[in-house]
Amino acid sequence: MKFRLRKPLAILSCAAAGVITLSACNFGSTLLGKPQKVVPASHGELIADEFVAFTQKEETFAAKLAACTYENYDGGENFTVSPISVYTALSLAAECAAGDTRDEILSALSVTHTELKKNISTLYRSLANDVRDGLTLLDMTNSIWVDESTQVNKSCIDALSNDYYCYSYSANFKKDNAAANGAVRRFVKDRTRGLIDKEYGLSDETAFAIINTLYLKDLWNLTGNDLPFTDEEYGFNNADGSVTQTKLLTGYYNGGKVYETDEYSAFYTKTLGSYKLKFILPNDGYTVDDIFTAENIATVNGLTDYGNSAPESGTYYATRCFFPEFKCGYDGDLAGILKEKFGIERLFKNPANESGACDFFTLTSSPAYCTAVYHTTELAVDKKGIEGAAGTIMPGGDGAPQPTEKYDFVIDRAFGFIITDSRDITLFSGVVNKI
């Protein structure tokens, strides 16, 4: 039995690489609205106490999402999610929702609606359209796709455009489903520069879909030269007990020493654009499953002092990472995790047959609910740089030369990682189980 008005909402959250200029009309869809011009966030906005507190809450969400998703991941393969992509898609959903549905989403994000409205623009502008010297690129795109039969409130569309930098499209999911799905597929492929190209199969009952895409690409150095490999091969201990003989990439020195705990050790390398690749390496007697927890992820990403120097001796410390090339990905539905671990339940309840059902009346008077939260990622780290994220540059001393102690941090077993921007906003987080 079908309910014409009780149409499901599909939230599509994607993370990976690519951006192509969006045309005003896409085959299978019509542009209803476009975001206001993006003005880069100012230094004052980025260091404001309220925004710093907001990003701390976002990073708590990021650590929990990465850990919970990995806990439910049974593929045994390399794994990564993009917490900022999921966070942004849920923020768009919160703006479209009302009542208890909105409250549940905001509770999962640990913010009030006022906090979200006041800070999401700064967060977006700190990430979107970050292009440096034509070599570094970080791009985020928000969009909402509305079925032609769905009546929407213009005030909500305007808020999405102005506060969330969101494109709005009309597509005929009901009467020309193939064309509508084709438009969504091309949009995601274009915005991710071909890294994500899949058929999502949004049904003819789709009232609207919320889509976030993220693309990051950076090099290790200004000249674009490859990172050198080690002269010798290392035995990389895969999570399944096998060993792969491989040469490791030799990262540049960064100030500080390896952060060590009883369970794991951590350090980072950087890209040309100051994106950071942070490694979480299990110590002997522990596995990556043991140490890739929300608490440990948050601790490592919150580190600001790696002990760069010893003032009493004037000694400067520097460490470089030896690490393998790797690829990671994810393709799944996060709805179950969001319900079980984050308490977002009403969003997924059908108004046709469930009490306490989804309320999207800020966007539309038609009853609607969410059927899935599709999340797809692709990430590659190699000798050229990162498509997804990366890190670079060694801090220099000030004044007279200082004695320097140099260390090597060898990543020779299955490990966890975090990829962030220069302000430690998590773009990707995951686990490399094997190479």
Where are these predicted regions, by residue range?
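Detector for small/aliphatic-rich hydrophobic stretches
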Residues: L9-S13, A17, A24-F173
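Non-catalytic interaction/Regulatory regions outside core domains
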Residues: L12, C25, K34-V39, T371-E378, ...
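Feature captures eukaryotic membrane-trafficking machinery centered on endolysosomal pathways
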Residues: A62-A63, N78-R102, Y268, P403-I435
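Non-catalytic, conformational "gating/processing" segments within enzyme and secreted inhibitor domains
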Residues: G76, E115-N283, Y306-Q402
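Short Gly/aromatic-enriched secondary-structure transition segments
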Residues: I105-L109, G224-Y234, D290-A298
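Short beta-strands and strand-coil junctions in structured, solvent-facing domains, enriched
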Residues: Y286-T287, T426
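Soluble, non-membrane globular domain cores that form compact, hydrophobic packing
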Residues: V300-L303
